[in-house]
Structure formats: C-alpha cells, structure tokens
Amino acid sequence: MFEEALLEKVDICNEILKDCRNELYLNLRFLDVALHSLVLEPSMSLGAAATDGAAFCYNPEYLIGLYKVGNVQVNRCYLHSILHCLFGHVWKKREEQELLYWNLACDIAVEYILDGLPLRCLRNPPKPYRRAVYEGLLKKIPVIHGEGVFHLLQDANPDMRIVARMVQEFTVDSHMLWQKDGSGPKSPIEQQNRWGDIRDKMELEMDVFSKEAAEGSKGLKAQLRVENRERYDYREFLKKFCILKEEMQVDLDSFDYI
C-alpha cells in the first residue's frame, strides 16, 4: 500500500517537473539543453531537493508541498539547481571550514539571477532585505557571482547572526551531493566538462541567436561571462558556432581579435 502511494506521488512529481521544464523553456529558450540535462530522481533520504550535476533529486512530499504553494516556487527551485550546475558550483572543492560561506555565496548568486529575470513564471518580488544584500554586494563587486561573494564573506567574516539570517533567506536546495568523488562516465570531471560545454554554447546563443529572449537576463549573462572568461577569436567562434548547427551570416565586426 505504501509503495503504491509512493509511486503515485512520484508520477505526480514527474508531471509537475515536466510542466516546470516546459514553462521555463517557453520563457528561456536559450536554456533548452540545460533544462533537460538532469535526470529526475525521487529520494526519500532528502528533506527537499538537491543535485550532483547528473540528477535533480527531490523528496516527493516536499515537491508536492512546494507545488501547492504555487508553480512559481517549483520553477525557481528547479532552475536554482540548474544554475548551480551551469556555474560549476557543484564541483568546486572547498575545505570543511569554507563550506558555510561557499554554500551561501552560491545561493546568493543564483537567487540574484532569478530575482532579476522579469518573467511571470519566476515572479517572486525580492524583499527589502534581499535588495539591500544585492545593493551592498554590487558596491564592492561589479558582478554578483559565487566566487566573488565567497571572498567578500571571507574578508568580512560577518557576525554569525548575520550569516544565519542570509542562510535563512537564500537557501533553496540542499548541497549535500556536491563535491562527490568518483570515476566513470558519470564522474565529476565528466559532468563538469559537460556542463562547461553547455555553458559555452549558451553564452554564444544568448549573444548571437537569442537577443530578444535574453533581454532582461543581464545578471545571468554577466555570470556566464565571468565563468567563460576567454574572449572569442575568429577560429574559436567558428568552432563553437559549428557545434550549434545553426545557419547565420557571420559579422566579423561583432567580436574582438586578441
């Protein structure tokens, strides 16, 4: 009886996440590959949701409860985990004593992107507290991204009450599956390289093919540029362009030569 009830809940969750992916794709087409790059995996050992770069793991009870609050919450939770993968947060090695600041920094960076996307499917107007955090960070770094926020937290070493307040505000998913060791076709290195390729193609698509779709996604684009620091020369552009298998008129004036 319990197993039947659980299977029914998993089926419901699969439908919820299918609708979530479709809605996000319709609004953010340049995220197509990324949105479908995680296997959906129910897990009763989790209290909420988590990703290891290969799967989106979720507690069925948690996901159904989130959906009852609203589909926006499900959309934000799923995209939150996708963005952790896109920016390589999952595989960055940190010492045990650094994990609190690193986890918080990554969550702030991802939530900043979500709060900046002017889409109804993600709409959750940031509270004054969030806005104050973002404004304070932007006075110190030009782009809010995981590495930058992490180093600011390290340097500031804020009172633990302040840290606890930020953790409460920005935590969405569990990071317990991050930094896993292993080997094989689903090894961390293999996953990291795969997501790096997705990130490269996505930045190019935002630059060349999806200017309208990317409008309003400046926070996302800025973080992509931080991760993809190398500038395109002509050969690199053509190489990545061919992978996209798209037809376009190459405008040689649209890039810098280094």
Language model regions located:
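Basic/hydrophobic alpha-helical interface regions
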Residues: M1-V74, Y78-R120
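Negatively charged
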Residues: D115-I258
